């Protein structure tokens, strides 16, 4: 199973940062007919993105175009089990995409609305945040 991750990066570990504010970039449907939009802030892991992508592709018919609009480029670290505090920051465990409210995470096109709603229902179960289905032009469904 190949997960999304950066091919190269300048620093191995990053600071956690905050999840304040909303998304000012990537908040409109740009490529497809429908989009899945985040309503909350959260870190979305590379595993969650892949699980959502598989659920989306399997619930749509062949010939449907799918775009993934988020990329996990932030490394997150974790200390091993049963290790006391201190001793420095843990080793990188994986990568996450920082998602803020308003961000379009997935887009797809060439599909009827009822099939789009069913695909949305399956994808939303794979994500740790509240999401909504939006149509191109900014209309919520």
From Swiss-Prot:
GO molecular function: rRNA binding; structural constituent of ribosome; tRNA binding
Keywords noted in UniProt: Ribonucleoprotein, Ribosomal protein, RNA-binding, rRNA-binding, tRNA-binding
Oxidoreductase recorded as keyword: no
SUPFAM superfamilies: Ribosomal protein L16p/L10e
Stored InterPro entries: Ribosomal_uL16 (IPR047873), Ribosomal_uL16_bact-type (IPR000114), Ribosomal_uL16_dom (IPR016180), Ribosomal_uL16_sf (IPR036920)
Residues making up the signal peptide according to the UniProt record: none
Any Pfam family matching the protein: Ribosomal_L16
Any one Gene Ontology cellular component term annotated for this protein: cytosolic large ribosomal subunit
Gene Ontology terms: biological process: translation
Subunit structure: Part of the 50S ribosomal subunit.
Summary of the function given for this chain in its UniProt record: Binds 23S rRNA and is also seen to make contacts with the A and possibly P site tRNAs.
Protein family according to the UniProt entry: Belongs to the universal ribosomal protein uL16 family.
Name under which the protein is recorded: Large ribosomal subunit protein uL16
């Amino acid at each position: 199973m190949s997960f999304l991750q950066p091919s190269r990066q300048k620093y191995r570990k990053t600071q956690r940062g905050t999840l304040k504010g909303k998304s000012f970039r990537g908040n409109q449907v740009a490529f497809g007919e429908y989009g899945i939009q985040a309503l909350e802030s959260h870190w979305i892991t590379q595993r969650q993105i892949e699980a959502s992508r598989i659920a989306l592709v399997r619930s749509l018919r062949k010939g449907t175009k799918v775009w993934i609009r988020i990329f996990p480029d932030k490394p997150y670290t974790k200390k091993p089990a049963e290790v006391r505090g201190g001793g420095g920051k843990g080793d990188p465990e994986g990568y996450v995409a920082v998602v803020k409210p308003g961000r379009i995470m997935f887009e797809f096109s060439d599909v009827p609305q009822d099939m789009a709603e069913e695909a949305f229902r399956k994808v939303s179960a794979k994500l740790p945040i509240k999401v909504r289905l939006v149509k191109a032009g900014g209309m919520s469904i």
